[in-house]
């Protein structure tokens, strides 16, 4: 499918899409000679996989279904007191807290995480996530180093070692990155970033972090050598991909394939923030001419730009 309007006509350059006007929940939105396609995954169109007597809702955004290679992303919503029982994966996972307070158990080691704190769980390490708030909802962003997300339940109990708001020791396989101001850097004017998981934090095949954009802030037009997922967790973002414009908010997620020029802007009067994830172990961006993002120049491909 190449469009979301009447008659399934291709979307014209410069069209701003608001999700209240979109009829198809998950559309492949471009058709070009390079066969490179972005997707916009709207929050209101996601269907939850329910766990634990409807206490935990798991939503998948980016995955093999939209063309992603080597990674997947989504969110999990926990009702008050709910938990996702011990499980493990055969790949890296990163869990970032978006709302609420989490209690994360890693083979008995217990950590408490607040907003934008992140836990990286290596392959094969059993872990459990709980909403320790008896009244409020817990919302987490998850990222897996596979395009086909799956969880293997672990029927085992571990002795408790409560670390509170502490961090793992050098002997522990997991990593906790706290959202602390001294680690935040200004990637572009008024755009402040914090790397939450990457190879240097133990992750294999994925990296990502949090980005906060003040009004009128933006990133320059750029490309990556790997696929990217961008989830807008606060405010409203404008996403430009080769002249196509998409408006995202409320955890709407953009999937940007490898080598496709794109940029994000905050054109609102309020702050905007995102969780970004790359299908690579360390972040890397290649700046290209802004006219490739605006659509004024035709993208020749990464090898020719």
Feature locations, PLM:
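A short, N-terminal "cap"/entry segment at the start of jelly-roll beta-barrel domains
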Residues: 2-69, 151-205, 289-305
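Conserved short histidine dyad/triad with adjacent acidic residue
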Residues: 55-60, 74-89, 209-223
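Ligand-binding loop in jelly-roll beta-barrel domains
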Residues: 68, 123-150, 238, 250, ...
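Residue-level marker of beta-strand positions
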Residues: 83, 118-120, 126, 218, ...
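A generic "binding-loop/recognition-motif" signal
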Residues: 90-91, 109, 125-126, 225, ...
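Glycine- and acidic-residue-biased ligand/ion/polar-headgroup-sensing regions
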Residues: 92-93, 97-102, 226-228, 232-237, ...
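Extended, hydrophobic interaction surfaces within ordered domains
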Residues: 94, 102-106, 110-164
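Short acidic-glycine-tyrosine-enriched beta hairpin
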Residues: 108-122, 243-258
């Amino acid at each position: 499918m190449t469009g979301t309007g009447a008659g399934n006509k291709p979307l014209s350059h410069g069209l701003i899409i608001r999700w209240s006007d979109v009829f198809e929940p998950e559309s492949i939105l471009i058709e070009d000679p390079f066969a490179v396609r972005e997707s916009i995954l709207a929050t209101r169109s996601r269907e939850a996989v329910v766990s634990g007597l409807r206490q935990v809702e798991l939503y998948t955004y980016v995955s093999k279904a939209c063309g992603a290679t080597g990674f997947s992303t989504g969110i999990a919503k926990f009702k008050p007191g709910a938990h996702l029982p011990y499980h493990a994966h055969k790949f890296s996972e990163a869990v970032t807290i978006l709302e609420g307070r989490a209690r994360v158990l890693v083979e008995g080691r217990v950590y408490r995480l607040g907003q934008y704190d992140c836990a990286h769980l290596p392959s094969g390490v059993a872990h459990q996530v709980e909403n320790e708030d008896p009244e409020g909802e817990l919302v987490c962003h998850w990222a897996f180093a596979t395009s086909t997300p799956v969880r293997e339940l672990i029927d085992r109990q571990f002795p408790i070692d409560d670390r509170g708001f502490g961090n793992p020791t050098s002997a522990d396989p997991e990593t906790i990155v706290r959202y602390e101001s001294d680690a935040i850097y200004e990637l572009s004017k008024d755009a402040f970033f914090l790397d939450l998981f990457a190879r240097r934090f133990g992750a294999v095949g994925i990296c990502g972090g949090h980005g906060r954009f003040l009004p009128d802030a933006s990133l320059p037009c750029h490309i990556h050598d790997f696929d990217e997922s961008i989830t807008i967790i606060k405010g409203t973002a404008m996403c430009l991909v080769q002249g196509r414009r998409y408006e995202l908010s409320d955890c709407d997620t953009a999937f940007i394939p490898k080598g496709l020029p794109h940029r994000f802007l905050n054109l609102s009067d309020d702050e905007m923030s995102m969780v970004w994830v790359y299908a690579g172990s360390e972040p890397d961006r290649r700046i290209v001419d802004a006219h490739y993002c605006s659509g004024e120049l035709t993208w020749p491909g990464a090898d020719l730009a």
